[in-house]
From Swiss-Prot:
<keyword id="KW-0804">Transcription</keyword>
<comment type="similarity">
    <text>Belongs to the LysR transcriptional regulatory family.</text>
</comment>
<protein>
    <recommendedName>
        <fullName>Uncharacterized HTH-type transcriptional regulator YeeY</fullName>
    </recommendedName>
</protein>
<dbReference type="GO" id="GO:0003700">
    <property type="term" value="F:DNA-binding transcription factor activity"/>
</dbReference>
<dbReference type="Pfam" id="PF03466">
    <property type="entry name" value="LysR_substrate"/>
</dbReference>
<dbReference type="InterPro" id="IPR005119">
    <property type="entry name" value="LysR_subst-bd"/>
</dbReference>
<feature type="domain" description="HTH lysR-type">
    <location>
        <begin position="1"/>
        <end position="60"/>
    </location>
</feature>
<dbReference type="GO" id="GO:0006355">
    <property type="term" value="P:regulation of DNA-templated transcription"/>
</dbReference>
<dbReference type="InterPro" id="IPR036390">
    <property type="entry name" value="WH_DNA-bd_sf"/>
</dbReference>
<keyword id="KW-0238">DNA-binding</keyword>
<dbReference type="InterPro" id="IPR036388">
    <property type="entry name" value="WH-like_DNA-bd_sf"/>
</dbReference>
<keyword id="KW-0805">Transcription regulation</keyword>
<dbReference type="GO" id="GO:0000976">
    <property type="term" value="F:transcription cis-regulatory region binding"/>
</dbReference>
<dbReference type="Pfam" id="PF00126">
    <property type="entry name" value="HTH_1"/>
</dbReference>
<dbReference type="InterPro" id="IPR000847">
    <property type="entry name" value="Tscrpt_reg_HTH_LysR"/>
</dbReference>
<feature type="DNA-binding region" description="H-T-H motif">
    <location>
        <begin position="20"/>
        <end position="39"/>
    </location>
</feature>
Length: 309
């Protein structure tokens, strides 16, 4: 295989530079050494790669095919070399990032672009989690790092975590929903009369639960907050939504915010990671997320106690 790789490199340089002399300078070898290497492969395989009948060697059809396919091989080999070096330095081959469904994924797009500009050898895989499902993905080994997780972190030294801030939630209904006309603050007895729209917990351990669902309250359980938002706008139910997700619909009048007795508006939000398996890619994402001003803005409180968005 090594002689073939050498020939592929020679053919690539020859086509780019135009002559054996120029190619030899690029490869730091003599023209005769390059010519001998190519000729030996031709002899071993009983093929002709170059037509040497003219002043300059020209590629035969076989030579052009080997050049074209060979460049793909060279690219793969070079990427493999870079990947091996990066892995040796501590960069993961793959990084699985669990993203809680309440987290605004669009804020990760600039970080993905920045990461791949310099660290393309690490493949990124994103998975979704809801409520306890985000922590579950981390503790069960399905994710290397999670972002936007709510509720309390696990009490194990295997995992590290840092608080991103607080997620503000608002109780919202459509203007034509019966609760829109009820006097504020709404009490639980009144809310319980109407169907809730909830997002199901994706935790695998134990029974899954739905957040802020009252006892014996009728509910539709959906798989993400985008669907929950759509159903509440349609008037099919009521419930809490992240303020950043609901705000433009509150501003347009598609939703109405209602105050609720003894409501908890802010939920602590975390980033967590596996201390045992964390490499350089995990560290890069942890640092960038914690330093990102746009992400901080989603989870920051303003002076009036509301989300800073």
């Amino acid at each position: 295989m090594k002689p073939l790789l050498d020939v592929l490199m020679i053919l690539d340089a020859l086509e780019k530079e135009g002559s054996f002399a120029a190619a030899s300078a690029k490869l730091y070898k003599t023209p005769s050494a390059l010519s001998y290497t190519v000729h030996k492969l031709e002899s071993d395989l009983n093929i002709q790669l170059l037509d040497r009948s003219g002043h300059r060697a020209k590629f035969t059809r076989t030579g052009k095919m080997l050049l074209e396919k060979g460049r793909e091989v060279l690219h793969t080999v070079r990427e493999l070399e870079k990947q091996a070096i990066k892995l040796h330095e501590g960069w993961e081959n793959e990084l699985v990032i669990g993203v809680d469904d309440t987290f605004p994924f669009s804020l990760l797009a600039p970080l993905i672009e920045a990461f791949y500009q310099h660290h393309s050898v690490t493949r990124l895989k994103f998975i979704n989690g809801v409520l306890g499902g985000s922590w579950d993905a981390l503790t069960q080994g399905r994710a290397d790092i999670i972002v936007g997780a709510m509720h309390e972190p696990p009490s194990s030294s295997e995992f590290g975590f840092s608080r991103l801030g607080d997620l503000e939630q608002v109780f919202a209904v459509a203007p034509h929903h019966p609760l829109a006309l009820e006097e504020e603050p709404l009490n639980r007895r009144i809310i319980k009369r109407y169907r809730a729209i909830v997002v199901g917990d994706t935790a695998q351990a134990g029974a899954s639960t739905a957040s802020q669902l009252l006892d014996e309250q009728e509910a539709i359980t959906v798989f993400d907050f985008k669907t929950k938002l759509e159903l509440q706008i349609s008037g099919l139910g009521c419930g809490y939504l992240p303020r950043y997700l609901a705000q433009r619909f509150l501003d347009s009048g598609a939703l109405i915010e209602k105050k609720v007795v003894a409501q908890t508006l802010f939920e602590p939000v975390w980033i967590g990671w596996n201390e045992q398996t964390a490499g350089l890619a995990s560290g890069w994402w942890r640092d960038e997320i914690l330093a990102n001003s746009a992400i901080a803005g989603v989870y920051a409180k303003s002076d009036d106690g509301k989300s800073a968005i």
